[in-house]
Amino acid sequence: MDLASRYKGVVGMVFGDNQSSNEDSYIQRLLDRISNGTLPDDRRTAIVELQSVVAESNAAQLAFGAAGFPVIVGILKDQRDDLEMVRGALETLLGALTPIDHARAQKTEVQAALMNSDLLSREAENITLLLSLLEEEDFYVRYYTLQILTALLMNSQNRLQEAILTTPRGITRLMDMLMDREVIRNEALLLLTHLTREAEEIQKIVVFEGAFEKIFSIIKEEGGSDGDVVVQDCLELLNNLLRSSSSNQILLRETMGFEPIISILKLRGITYKFTQQKTVNLLSALETINMLIMGRADTEPGKDSNKLANRTVLVQKKLLDYLLMLGVESQWAPVAVRCMTFKCIGDLIDGHPKNRDILASKVLGEDRQVEPALNSILRIILQTSSIQEFVAADYVFKTFCEKNTEGQTMLASTLIPQPHPTSRDHLEDDVHMSFGSMLLRGLCSGEADGDLETCCRAASILSHVVKDNLRCKEKALKIVLESPMPSMGTPEPLFQRIVRYLAVASSMKSKEKSSTLGKSYIQQIILKLLVTWTVDCPTAVQCFLDSRHHLTFLLELVTDPAATVCIRGLASILLGECVIYNKSIENGKDAFSVVDAVGQKMGLTSYFSKFEEMQNSFIFSPSKKPPQGYKPLTRTPTPSEAEINEVDEVDEMVKGNEDHPMLLSLFDASFIGLVKSLEGNIRERIVDVYSRPKSEVAVVPADLEQKSGENEKDYINRLKAFIEKQCSEIQNLLARNAALAEDVASSGRNEQSQGSEQRASTVMDKVQMESIRRELQETSQRLETVKAEKAKIESEASSNKNMAAKLEFDLKSLSDAYNSLEQANYHLEQEVKSLKGGESPMQFPDIEAIKEEVRKEAQKESEDELNDLLVCLGQEESKVEKLSAKLIELGVDVDKLLEDIGDESEAQAESEED
Amino acid sequence: MSYAYLFKYIIIGDTGVGKSCLLLQFTDKRFQPVHDLTIGVEFGARMITIDNKPIKLQIWDTAGQESFRSITRSYYRGAAGALLVYDITRRETFNHLASWLEDARQHANANMTIMLIGNKCDLAHRRAVSTEEGEQFAKEHGLIFMEASAKTAQNVEEAFIKTAATIYKKIQDGVFDVSNESYGIKVGYGGIPGPSGGRDGSTSQGGGCCG
Ligand SMILES: Nc1nc2c(ncn2[C@@H]2O[C@H](COP(=O)(O)OP(=O)(O)O)[C@@H](O)[C@H]2O)c(=O)[nH]1
Ligand SMILES: [Mg+2]
């Protein structure tokens, strides 16, 4: 932004103003006294006066601006020895750059401080000058200089970052300030925090200059998480350095290690009191941990190794223990801290099988009161009064179960119904309760007191346990629960019990409809479980359809105007799963019957429209923001406030929507992906089923003929019966056709008001017509291909015949050749035999003679060589003998020496082989 | 993680001479023929042993382009060692050595140890700078010299270790005040806190606390 031109305009305006012009001439006079005065004392008084005037009013700051800077900079440059003048100059400068509070009242007024910052930072030289002042002895000089730099940074960040970067040793000087007296150190900390915001190169240089060591030593000095706001500043600086730089993350890991940051999370003894500052400090440290867990903000594909290495090292350094202590065992930690802790635990094990196993093996508590950490987390989920905490802890199970068949199986293996508790013992009292028992207890807690909240949280966990795991699904399907009142009713499968709770929840909801009492997520979460469970699982479909009421209820739910978009959508998906995963052939329970029921209840158009409505809702829309965005903590927030803010923000986004905002986090990307893919499959399959009604009457042309021996009457009766059956089928089809026509007509009626439905219906028609046309086309194509195939096979057969003849011929000539070869071989063998036997020695005289000659020659040659070698060896041996004698004279253990030499040469030979 | 000394290195030289490859070969023992241009500065670290003492090397790999010079200069002063690299197959990278050296002399501390590396010596058939010329340049400017290949790993270990050994020797000879971290040296556990500290038995303030 170019403020200079505006500045001129404003100055002009100010000059036009009488009062200001007075001020201006006053300042002019002061500046004159400062630069041209001869009496040192007078100059000092003048600068003190100037300083107080400038600090007071916006107008004075404006008037000071362009004229004042050269004078002040001159003092700083050339009169360093006059400490008082330098101090005064710096204070004046600071005054000119600090916005005056009551100036805000007059909104039209130009912010003089802003313009002055702009003027001053325009010259990089000025910044260099200021940085050089940091080396002055005087405390105040350094202190004011830091404040001036901070003020400039706040107003013209980029320019200052650049200027400091290009000043040789500029950053070094600032870093040195961290080792200065406390007041200066704190000031420097703030400055560096601003300086490192979104400036990667500065971040790296700051780290190069040893920032990590300095930061952690300050944190330690200040008492870790118990320290004051300085600790928070330190952590903010640290987070700036680590947020987007994998290079800096590696450096921390490879040099200081992660212990210093992890140890900030360590609670000393039992902590009862979490002050606001301590909470903020812990949250900041958890943010650091989270950055390390997530690697760089924008994950490049190749740089995944950094992220994984971070996760491994963090767990090696016992981070999990501290997190569990903070999030699970410490009952006094504020909810915000506990939530952040769960998020970190979840991310730490996400896609990291080893860390997952370590978490699974962790136990908490002491002596006999130990229990697996996962059980403790489950208990928190079931019992916490905070929805945020439930969602955060739920995330741990989500990441634990994802692509972890073994872990899911381990959790599911304990899903064994306990005999009904006689006295209602409390969950918290029994650390010996298995994971599965606790989960089942949670699931059934609706039975006793209609506590569907706990039930739905348990349902959420169960959906992680069965997700994508057919064995766990089957296992859970086999669970049969006793009837709450044994006298009434029979035992009930878990799956059906959960469907029943869904029904209870929806009836409760419709009763409470008039009350504006908050949004609920109970039905959605239970539906999520049922949808997840039923995927790829015909047994679940069967179990669902075992009771005719279920289908009726689900159809009601899909069309229930009181239900939310999301509930209706998920119910439709569940309904669709009853079609696509239906393996039943039983009348009334097969895929066709379900489709039929849908068609009769609401019509396919209206059914499909539920999907679209849901996909358009905020939870499914792709524009939904990732739930984990970077949000800096302000310097003095109250944690509870921060939480409220967060919820508010989400609320803002979903205004006018009936679904609970927490579903944003609970419906993770993989679930949303699942729903989308299911939707596609369902549409396809339903059209398929609908367009091919199974025929009740098999038409076999031969049946229509009079059978031999059949008399006319019987024949006619048979035909009559046949025609009756066909007639009823035609009636049936006509009725269906009418329903479909009505569906089309009614969607046509809604055409004007509801474009989307109309579109859906024409899409439907098109799809059906398309499928018929396709079938026709396919059949004729098939005919063509069959014909072509026949021709091909025929020609193939004839060519094969030819081939066979040829092969036969070949075989014959081959066998002839073989025979003659064998004959030749036989002759040769005979010859060899006779040669060996010496029966005909003169048959090949030349060869024998030559062979003999060559043999002799070779023998002679090798003999010669051997002789040479022997001579050499003899020489060597005598040498060794001589040397040995000499060495013995000198007192050396010759045998040992010779042995060593042997070993060495062996070793050498070996290594040469490598 | 504990070390007797920590040395900071920088790697400088024209773009494309193989600085990043040398660092990768040294820290990860691998060669990556195609990789991104270094933007600004990248970091690597490794532990070595000299005189039976564990020594941690922190290495900053800089970008060679002119536009990054002002940034990379910030790293000179705090470095104990510099690897100045040229490419034996590209004459101009050798010709630029003087300007790099000038930069280093101007911004680095006077005791910085500089190792001149003629890289890509595996490409002997494309050689454009003879070994003797490299030697001669090093001799004239008081540098240590080696030809190396980041591709075959030839002399890569040696170059980094020889530099460290030289720095180590300088410490033993009392050239540095090692309590002053601006020389790019830090004393950890088991390191001698410099000759002066050794004599009067006090340990230096700067080192050892955070190993
Ligand atoms: N043959 C060969 N190629 C190398 C060697 N070192 C680096 N290179 C190649 O030279 C190019 C530049 O390397 P790089 O490390 O990015 O250079 P930098 O700009 O100095 O960091 C890359 O294509 C490398 O594959 C080496 O020792 N031998
Ligand atoms: Mg590079």
From Swiss-Prot, chain A:
It holds the Pfam family Uso1_p115_head. GO terms for biological process: post-embryonic development; protein exit from endoplasmic reticulum; vesicle fusion with Golgi apparatus. Keywords: Coiled coil, Golgi apparatus, Phosphoprotein, Protein transport, Transport. The keyword Phosphoprotein applies. Disruption phenotype: Dwarf plants and accumulation of the precursors of the two major storage proteins albumin 2S and globulin 12S in dry seeds. The modification Phosphoserine is found at residue 911. It comes from the Eukaryota. Residues 723-837, 863-901 form a coiled coil. InterPro entries: ARM-like, ARM-type_fold, Uso1_p115_C, Vesicle_P115, Vesicle_Uso1_P115_head. It is found in: Golgi apparatus; Golgi apparatus, Golgi stack. The keyword Glycoprotein does not apply. GO terms for cellular component: cytosol; Golgi apparatus; Golgi membrane; Golgi stack. The C-terminal domain (689-914) is necessary and sufficient for Golgi targeting. Golgi matrix protein playing a role in tethering of vesicles to Golgi membranes and in maintaining the overall structure of the Golgi apparatus. Functions in the anterograde transport of storage protein precursors from the endoplasmic reticulum (ER) to the Golgi complex. This is Golgin candidate 6. It comes from Arabidopsis thaliana (Mouse-ear cress). The lineage of its organism: Eukaryota, Viridiplantae, Streptophyta, Embryophyta, Tracheophyta. The gene is GC6.
Curated annotation (Swiss-Prot), chain B:
GTP binds at residues 13-21, 61-65, 119-122, 149-151. It is found in: Cell membrane. A lipid is attached at residues 209-210 (S-geranylgeranyl cysteine). Its main location: membrane. GO terms for biological process: endoplasmic reticulum to Golgi vesicle-mediated transport; protein transport. The keyword Nucleotide-binding applies. The keyword Kinase does not apply. It holds the Pfam family Ras. It comes from the Eukaryota. Keywords: Acetylation, Cell membrane, GTP-binding, Lipoprotein, Membrane, Nucleotide-binding, Prenylation, Protein transport, Transport. Belongs to the small GTPase superfamily. Rab family. This is Ras-related protein RABB1c. It comes from Arabidopsis thaliana (Mouse-ear cress). The gene is RABB1C.
